């Protein structure tokens, strides 16, 4: 495993941990999981979205281009998320250790908020969260076709309302608080 692939795998693992609850409690019913997933985005998006469980199991087939996943039990730091196809492709491509590029903007909603163990270092695991950990309230995330478009934005949530997670890496994501 090359260092580049190790970094990519770690970043994607962190992203998945932030956005998809890998430790979903079995006590949540299918209906509760669907309701949790739908809470991630505005109703006009989530009402027709495909809903996947944390492990990728189809909970509900959708009719629009969005895919949503439920959050975990309260206190788990796992939050519901809804992604457009670009964000889904980014997650899958980087997870596979492949390069990613896009000509269009990718969108993701996390209206219940989210948690990053470290906004600067994509290698930090949830269990190792420290001084750079950050909880963000309701927000959306953007993947941009060019990192040059983000040069004017801070990589520190303490500096700006809108900021870039993993600033200076190939995995920059814009966080837009709502």
Task: Label the model's feature ranges.
Residues 19-20:
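N-terminal signal peptide c-region/cleavage motif recognized by signal peptidases
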Residues 1-11:
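Bacterial N-terminal signal peptides that target proteins for export
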Residues 26-178:
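Primary mode marks residue(s) on the alpha4-beta5-alpha5 output face of response regulator receiver
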């Amino acid at each position: 495993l090359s260092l580049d692939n190790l970094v990519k795998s770690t970043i994607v693992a962190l992203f998945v941990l932030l956005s998809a609850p890998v430790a979903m409690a079995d006590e949540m019913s299918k209906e509760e999981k669907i309701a949790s997933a739908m809470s991630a985005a505005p109703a006009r998006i989530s009402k027709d979205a495909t809903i996947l469980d944390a492990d990728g199991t189809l909970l509900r087939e959708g009719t629009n281009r969005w895919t949503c996943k439920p959050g975990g039990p309260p206190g788990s730091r796992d939050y519901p998320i809804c992604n457009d196809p670009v964000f889904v492709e980014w997650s899958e491509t980087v997870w596979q250790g492949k390069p990613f590029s896009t000509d269009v903007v990718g969108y993701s909603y996390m209206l219940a908020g989210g948690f990053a163990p470290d906004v600067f270092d994509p290698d930090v695991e949830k269990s190792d969260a420290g001084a750079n950990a950050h909880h963000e309230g309701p927000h959306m995330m953007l993947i941009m076709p060019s990192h040059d478009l983000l040069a004017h934005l801070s990589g520190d949530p303490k500096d700006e309302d809108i900021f870039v997670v993993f600033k200076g890496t190939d995995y920059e994501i814009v966080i837009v608080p709502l």
